[in-house]
C-alpha cells in the first residue's frame, strides 16, 4: 500500500487541520481568531480559498485569496529574485613585470569593465628567466595596480609569490 502523495506549497481549505486560525480577509483586513470551519465557510462565500500563510504562528495565520493567483505571484517573485541574482565571476588579467605603459592602460580598462560588472579580478604576474631574480619589480607593479584601483576595488588577496608567478585578487567595492 502506498502513502498518499505529499502536497507541495501551503495548506489550504480542508487541509488546514488546526481548531482555530487568525483570519485575514481578501481585502487584507484582520478578522481575528475564529474556528477553522467558520474561516473555510467565509472563504467559500467569497468564492475564494482559505490559504495558510504563516503555519508556525500561534494560532496559524490564514488568508482568504485566489490560490491560483497567489501561486502565480509567488512564482513571479521567485523569477524576479533569480534575475536580480548575479554570480560573481573571477576574471583573470595576466601581466609581465616589464609591461609597457600603453599595454598596462589597455589591461586597466578591461579591469575597470570587470569591476563595473561586479566581477572579481585575479591579477597574475608572470616572471620569465632572469626576471625571477627581481620580484621587487613585480611587487612594485602590483602596488601601482592597487593604488590605481583603490576607489573601485579592494584587495581580497594580497600579492604573493606562487612558483614563477605573483598573484593578487581584487574585488569590487
Swiss-Prot record:
Pfam name, any one: IF3_C
Q: Which BP terms in the Gene Ontology apply to this protein?
A: ribosome disassembly
Name the domain of life: Bacteria
| Entry annotated with the keyword Repressor | no
The terms under GO molecular function for this entry are: ribosome binding; translation initiation factor activity
What main location does UniProt list?
Answer: cytoplasm
Places the protein is found: Cytoplasm
**GO CC annotation terms, alphabetical:** cytosol; membrane
Which PROSITE patterns does the UniProt record give? Answer: IF3
The UniProt entry, under Gene3D superfamilies, shows: Translation initiation factor 3 (IF-3), C-terminal domain, Translation initiation factor 3 (IF-3), N-terminal domain
Entry's InterPro entries? T_IF-3_C_sf, T_IF-3_N_sf, Translation_initiation_fac3_CS, Translation_initiation_fac_3, Translation_initiation_fac_3_C, Translation_initiation_fac_3_N
For this UniProt record, the keywords arranged alphabetically read as follows: Cytoplasm, Initiation factor, Protein biosynthesis
Q: How does it assemble?
A: Monomer.
Q: Describe the task this protein carries out.
A: IF-3 binds to the 30S ribosomal subunit and shifts the equilibrium between 70S ribosomes and their 50S and 30S subunits in favor of the free subunits, thus enhancing the availability of 30S subunits on which protein synthesis initiation begins.
Assigned protein family: Belongs to the IF-3 family.
UniProt-recorded name of the protein: Translation initiation factor IF-3
Phylogenetic classification of the source organism: Bacteria, Pseudomonadati, Pseudomonadota, Alphaproteobacteria, Caulobacterales
Amino acid at each position: 500500500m502506498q502513502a498518499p502523495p505529499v502536497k507541495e506549497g501551503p495548506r489550504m481549505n480542508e487541509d488546514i487541520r488546526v481548531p482555530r486560525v487568525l483570519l485575514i480577509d481578501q481585502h487584507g483586513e484582520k478578522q481575528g481568531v475564529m474556528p477553522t470551519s467558520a474561516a473555510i465557510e467565509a472563504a467559500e462565500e467569497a468564492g475564494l480559498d482559505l490559504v495558510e500563510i504563516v503555519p508556525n504562528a500561534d494560532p496559524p495565520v490564514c488568508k482568504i485569496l485566489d490560490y491560483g493567483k497567489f501561486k502565480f505571484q509567488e512564482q513571479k517573485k521567485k523569477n524576479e529574485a533569480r534575475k536580480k541574482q548575479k554570480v560573481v565571476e573571477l576574471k583573470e588579467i595576466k601581466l609581465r613585470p616589464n609591461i609597457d605603459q600603453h599595454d598596462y592602460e589597455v589591461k586597466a580598462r578591461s579591469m575597470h569593465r570587470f569591476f563595473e560588472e561586479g566581477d572579481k579580478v585575479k591579477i597574475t604576474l608572470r616572471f620569465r628567466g632572469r626576471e625571477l631574480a627581481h620580484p621587487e619589480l613585480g611587487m612594485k607593479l602590483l602596488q601601482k595596480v592597487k593604488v590605481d584601483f583603490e576607489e573601485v576595488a579592494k584587495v581580497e588577496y594580497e600579492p604573493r609569490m606562487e612558483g614563477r608567478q605573483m598573484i593578487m585578487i581584487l574585488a569590487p567595492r
